[in-house]
Amino acid sequence: MRLYSAKVPPIAQEVVRVLLSSKDIDLEDAGAQKEVVADVESVLRSYLETERVVDDKTRDLLERTGRGANEFGKVREQLAEHHGIKVGDESLDFILDQVVAMLMHSSHVEEVYAEDVVLRRHMAPIFKKHMGADSDVDVEVRAQLKHLKEGTAAWDIEYARTLDNVKRRRGLG
């Protein structure tokens, strides 16, 4: 699962809408909803920016040290921890924690009525739906490459090209 910048506004709007409709949070006034959406977007954009920095530093470090791309995940995880974020399977939990903390401290949220666990339970499906775009994209790309044998150089090249096309078409680029 991966968070895409194009998905930030829909996620933020849906999270705030769901939390308001389930009466988990109460806002200071009707106009504050836009501000809370902007606060959620800010949390998500901050995560994306830090993740981008971690990815860039990981690539640089692997290049400088001559280590293989097979160590990317391990090095990325260590650098992410150094930068104070979680990546990979733990990213969803980390992002949910950040959004809950923001809701607790936001001046636009008058009251948080639900426990942290309930907030997370209401937000998680929204994030999973939008962050699961990766697996949908992968299924679509693989369906278009049935004529090639997986693992061959031609398959790798076509997979990358088709993946770019599908992501661009879906606005995930």
Language-model segments: which ranges?
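N-terminal interaction modules that seed assembly of large macromolecular complexes
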Residues: 2-73
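FKBP-type peptidyl-prolyl cis-trans isomerases
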Residues: 3-12, 19, 23, 79, ...
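Short, residue-level hotspots on alpha-helical faces of the histone-fold
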Residues: 14, 77, 98-101, 125, ...
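Conserved, well-folded catalytic cores of nucleic-acid-processing
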Residues: 18-22, 61-64, 78-85, 102-106, ...
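Short, tandemly repeated low-complexity microdomains enriched for cysteine and small residues
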Residues: 28-33, 112-115, 137
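Conserved mixed alpha/beta catalytic, RNA-binding, or beta-rich assembly cores of soluble enzyme
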Residues: 41-47, 67-130
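Alpha-helical oligomerization segments
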Residues: 133-173
